[in-house]
Amino acid sequence: MEKLASLYHEHISTLQQRTCEALARNQFDALLIHSGELQHIFLDDRDYPFKVNACFKAWVPVTKVPNCWLWVDGINKPKLWFYSPVDYWHSVEPLPTSYWTKEVEMIHLANAGDINSALSTYVKQNVAYIGCSPQRAKEIGFSERNINPKSVLDYLHFHRSYKTDYELVCMREAQKTAIVGHLAAYEAFQAGMSEFDINISYLMATGHRDTDVPYNNIIAMNENAAVLHYTALQHNAPSDIRSFLIDAGAEYNGYAADITRTYSAKSNNEFASLIKDMDAEQKALISTIKVGTRYTEYHIQMHHRIAKLLKKYGIVKDVSEEVMVEEGLTTPFFPHGIGHPLGLQVHDVAGFMQDDTGTHLAAPDMYPYLRCTRILEPRMVLTIEPGLYFIESLLAPWRESEFSKHFDWNKIGTLKLFGGIRIEDNIVIHENKVENMTRDLQLP
């Protein structure tokens, strides 16, 4: 914890420097960052699960407490109004005392409505509000111009791509937790459990509730693995278990892990061989990644690797790998991007920003679902998650195309029973190497 405290001190110093620059560029004196508010379910007396503002948890590892407010000006110690009411209906977070609390001035907020008077001397013309409730900001006294100003957010989001040492430690810890869950889920799969029960096994192993994980776990067997964001969780195991895809993460101090593995129920069939080769291609792709190259290039490179696999397994025949990629024959098999930035959010911000003024570079027209077009630089954290699926809705147009004769539709029909493959690691870009946080922890 001592090391974490030291790294957190450096982290706050970095955030203060970024804030100073963002404020100076935009003629603001300070930022007021709101943790968020509970959202009521329509015509009910309950709330949706609370999800904290990522801009807030960038500063303090407070992820489950609404109605908190953070004042930062880049120079003085940040002020944190921490909401901790007297409440016998609900559990309440006490004022924290931890490795990070000496870096902020803690102010007890006993009633959420008291924030208006508490902030009366702070809300001035040159203060910006960052948060999810423009209406609350207006009630406090913010003008429309000062609510979530785009130029401020663009600057902060762009620089959030470069993780501090504290953030990298937190992300490595999230990896450890997620991997414990993945190993437990694999054991549950081997024991013949259902998707629902495998998910329970994962949550128990990680110590997460289903509202704590950074995204809804994807636990998919057989054809369900062809649904990219499958979250239905069948309660009964299939009578014939053929394959298992798990895409599940964990969170540590607000930072996410996002890991995917695919398994064949039998080790001696063609699908198992395809998984093994896909795993090799994913690792080979990572070995080519280096500073100064646009992320888009690795997405395109992976399409060439997918073409090689399609040809090797006779899924697509009598056409060169180059033509497969040029004509888009690989796209129905690999319809999503190679990955995305990772951090405080699973799909972290600024994937398309080319500079800190927010210059946008969209994904190529041919690959519209790619989530990052940045040039890779040290301290960036990204996922590498190639996929190879057998999705009828994407394959159907090719049945009637001029290239239909090159597809082995009988083989595709057989492989559709397995759904698909996705293999995902989380990597850190360093000056002279790529750190694979996932593989470094020995997840096969």
From Swiss-Prot:
The keyword Metal-binding applies. It is an enzyme of class 3 (hydrolase). The keyword Hydrolase applies. Binds 2 manganese ions per subunit. Its EC number is 3.4.13.9. GO terms for molecular function: aminopeptidase activity; metal ion binding; metalloexopeptidase activity; phosphoric triester hydrolase activity; proline dipeptidase activity. It catalyses: Xaa-L-Pro dipeptide + H2O = an L-alpha-amino acid + L-proline. Its cofactor is Mn(2+). It comes from the Bacteria. Mn(2+) 2 binds at D247, D258, E424. GO terms for biological process: proteolysis. Mn(2+) 1 binds at D258, H340, E385, E424. InterPro entries: Creatin/AminoP/Spt16_N, Creatinase/aminopeptidase-like, PepQ_N, Pept_M24, Peptidase_M24B_aminopep-P_CS, X-Pro_dipept-like, X_Pro_dipept. Pfam families: PepQ_N, Peptidase_M24. Keywords: Dipeptidase, Hydrolase, Manganese, Metal-binding, Metalloprotease, Protease. GO terms for cellular component: cytosol. HAMAP family: X_Pro_dipeptid. Splits dipeptides with a prolyl residue in the C-terminal position. Belongs to the peptidase M24B family. Bacterial-type prolidase subfamily. This is Xaa-Pro dipeptidase.
